[in-house]
């Protein structure tokens, strides 16, 4: 029985979509894999490690619209002819983080539903790519970021990781800080998003540290909260 369960687990964790414009280097689709890789995925450690002259140019943009409500991930693969492949992944209506830590092998049948990314794909023309890259440039999206900026899981924020012509870049934007005043690219990117889940727009909320999850028992309201901290050229190690 243990061998069967182990094989089932391996099959579940090994499922990787091959329908994207170009295959991403990390699989963050399945919930257990995402719980292990999510922070390094947002930090784009894979992109940074492979960023060198002569390599492929690509960007990863993460829109965290309150972790438990919605997250949208955009992978942009720039092509030599000026076009680009855009892969879109959306997580919506996620359960509290405590559920991830409580998953057991016997619950394999339950982990592939609401936790799976809904996916979309677009091929952008050279003109569309030019407009998008221009809006990113106007947003200072290629860095440097504000050192020490905090990104709580239950806030609205963006991160942009990039490798362009072998040059690494990183930027982050936190909605409560400046109401996304410097984010010039969001509407352009959302216009390319063909996943049939409405974008969770930023809204004014009380400070993240004061908010509680009513579904958690008393004393556990903040136990599963997490926060990312921006460094001089990327996310600080957790």
Where are these regions (language model features)?
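Sec/Tat signal peptide C-region and signal peptidase I cleavage site
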Residues: 17-21
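Function-determining sites in protein domains
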Residues: 22-238
């Amino acid at each position: 029985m243990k061998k069967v369960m182990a094989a089932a687990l391996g099959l579940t964790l090994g499922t990787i979509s091959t329908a994207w414009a170009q295959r991403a280097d990390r699989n963050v689709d399945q919930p257990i894999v995402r719980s292990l890789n999510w922070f390094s995925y947002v930090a784009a450690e894979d992109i940074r490690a492979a960023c060198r002259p002569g390599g492929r140019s690509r960007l990863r943009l993460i829109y965290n619209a309150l972790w438990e409500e919605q997250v949208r991930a955009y992978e942009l693969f720039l092509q030599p002819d000026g076009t680009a492949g855009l892969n879109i992944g959306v997580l919506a209506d996620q359960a509290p983080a405590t559920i991830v830590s409580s998953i057991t092998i016997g619950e394999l049948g339950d982990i592939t539903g609401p936790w799976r990314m809904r996916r979309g794909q677009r091929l952008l023309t050279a003109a569309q790519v030019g407009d998008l890259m221009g809006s990113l440039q106007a947003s200072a999206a290629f860095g440097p970021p504000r050192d020490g900026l905090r990104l709580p899981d239950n806030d609205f924020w963006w991160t942009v990781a990039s490798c362009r012509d072998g040059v690494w870049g990183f930027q982050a934007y936190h909605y409560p800080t400046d109401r996304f005043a410097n984010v010039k690219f969001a509407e352009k990117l959302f216009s390319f998003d063909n996943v049939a889940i409405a974008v969770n727009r930023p809204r004014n909320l009380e400070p993240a540290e004061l908010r509680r999850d009513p579904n958690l028992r008393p004393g556990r309201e903040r136990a599963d909260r997490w926060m990312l901290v921006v460094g001089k050229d990327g996310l600080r190690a957790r």
